[in-house]
């Protein structure tokens, strides 16, 4: 089961929405198996920017011996993040593709698909990076709020919740005259990449009031703040392959 997230939406240049579920559970793992504990420690190392520890752990463990669970898929995901951080894009792609092959039903597989999509754009679209930089500048300038009708909550990444890791993602996106969101992109996030995918998937489902006279802003920017809350621990040891 994918747990609902606790998050705050900050409209850039506008009022802050009050926090939701700010309490944090202690960083403990009761009855954790070795794969889950190893994956959780890797996420905590990544939170601190320590990809060397993630990569050292990856070199020591035998993932083939791990069951095909969310913990295993999430470990592969953070390996891919670190490969991107090291600018080893070929290794990142292969890691994400392996995740899709071996854990196609996992939450982490959705994030892997998002990263592969972005990597394809970076490789094939010469104007992509300039477009992202333009979106970043627009986000910093703020935006006139369109009236929201439906905001689907972002889902908290399961292993990040277990590891009690918080963070944020800033999403810049268009809103069509009829109120659909269009082409959301991440312009800032911390820890890098960790909440990007879930933030994008949520914003794609959002709906705004229509703008029949065309007087409202076509671009919006929202900062999603993710705060781990005391909730049922997600099942990271359930099978994630058919």
Model-based region annotation:
Residues 117-161, 200-205, 230-238:
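Acidic, low-complexity proline/glycine/alanine-rich linker and hinge segments
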Residues 165, 176-212:
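A short, well-structured alpha-helical segment
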Residues 63-71, 100-115, 189-193:
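Short solvent-exposed coil/turn linkers within tandem alpha-helical repeat scaffolds
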Residues 163-178, 201, 213-242:
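A beta-hairpin/wing motif
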Residues 18-41:
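Bacterial Sec signal peptide processing site at the extreme N-terminus
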């Amino acid at each position: 089961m994918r747990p609902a997230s606790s998050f705050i939406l900050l409209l850039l240049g506008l009022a802050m929405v009050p926090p939701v579920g700010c309490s944090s559970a202690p960083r403990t793992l009761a009855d954790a198996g070795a794969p889950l504990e190893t994956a959780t420690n890797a996420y905590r190392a990544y939170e601190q920017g320590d990809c060397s520890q993630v990569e050292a752990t990856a070199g020591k463990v035998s993932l083939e011996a791990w069951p095909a669970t969310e913990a295993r898929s999430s470990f592969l995901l953070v390996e891919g993040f670190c490969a991107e951080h090291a600018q080893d894009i070929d290794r990142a792609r292969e890691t994400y593709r392996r995740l899709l092959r071996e854990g196609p039903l996992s939450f982490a597989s959705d994030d892997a698909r998002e990263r592969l999509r972005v990597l394809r754009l970076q490789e094939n679209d010469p104007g992509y990076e300039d477009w992202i930089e333009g979106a970043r500048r627009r986000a910093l300038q703020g935006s006139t709020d369109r009236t929201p009708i439906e905001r689907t909550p972002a889902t908290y990444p399961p292993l990040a919740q277990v590891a009690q890791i918080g963070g944020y993602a800033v999403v810049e996106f268009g809103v069509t005259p009829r109120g659909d969101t269009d082409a959301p992109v991440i312009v800032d996030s911390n820890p890098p990449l960790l909440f990007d995918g879930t933030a994008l998937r949520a914003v794609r489902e959002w709906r705004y009031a229509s703008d029949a006279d065309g007087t409202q802003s076509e671009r919006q920017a929202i900062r999603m703040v993710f705060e781990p809350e005391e909730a049922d621990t997600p099942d990271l040891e359930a099978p994630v392959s058919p």
